[in-house]
Amino acid sequence: MSIKSQTNNMRRLAALLNINLCNIHGKKECGPNGSKQVFLNVGKVFLRALARDLGLREVTVSSNAGGIGVSGECSLIGMWENGGLYVSISQPACGSGKVLLYRTVRHSRDYKGGYNHFITRHELEKWSYTHLLDALCALRKDWESDEQAA
C-alpha cells in the first residue's frame, strides 16, 4: 500500500476513533456493526500494510470486536531478527485520547513486552505515515542497542 493510502487510513482511523464506537442507541448487539465494523476492517488493513512497511516477519494481525460497551481493538504482533513489535489500536473508555499502543516484544507470544508507548488520536490525525514509521523504527533501534549493551 502506498504512503498516501496509509496516511489516508490513519486519518480515517482517527475520525472513527473520534466517535463513540460502542454506542448503538439501546439496540442489542448481534456482532459488530456500523462504524465499529468499519473501524475493525480499516484497522486490520492498516496494520497489515504497516507490518510489511516495517519489514516484520511472523506477523499476526487480529481484531476483537469485544462487547456492546467497548470499541473493540485491532492488534499486530510481528518479529524482526532479534525481537519484535506489538501494536494495538482501540478507543479508550476513559477518554484519554491514547488510541495506539506500541511496545517491543521478545517473541510472538510475549504479551508483556517492553514499556508501553502511546500515540494519541490527535497525533494519528496530524502525523504523516512516515512520521509514524520513524517512531516505530526508533523503538527497534532502542531495542537493538539495549540488546548489544547486555
Question: What are the residue ranges of the model-derived segments?
Answer:
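Short intrinsically disordered terminal tails
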Residues: 1-8, 141-150
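Negatively charged, low-complexity tracts enriched in Asp/Glu with abundant Ser/Thr
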Residues: 3-80
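Intrinsic disorder/low-complexity signature
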Residues: 5-6, 15, 20, 113, ...
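N-terminal cationic amphipathic segment used for targeting or macromolecule association
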Residues: 12, 49, 133, 147-148
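Alpha-helical protein-protein interaction elements
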Residues: 17, 31, 38, 62-66, ...
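Generic secondary-structure transition motif, activating predominantly at the C-termini of alpha-helices
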Residues: 21, 54-55, 140-147
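Charged, low-complexity intrinsically disordered regions
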Residues: 40, 47, 135-143
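Intrinsically disordered, low-complexity regulatory segments enriched in Ser/Thr/Pro
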Residues: 73-134, 145
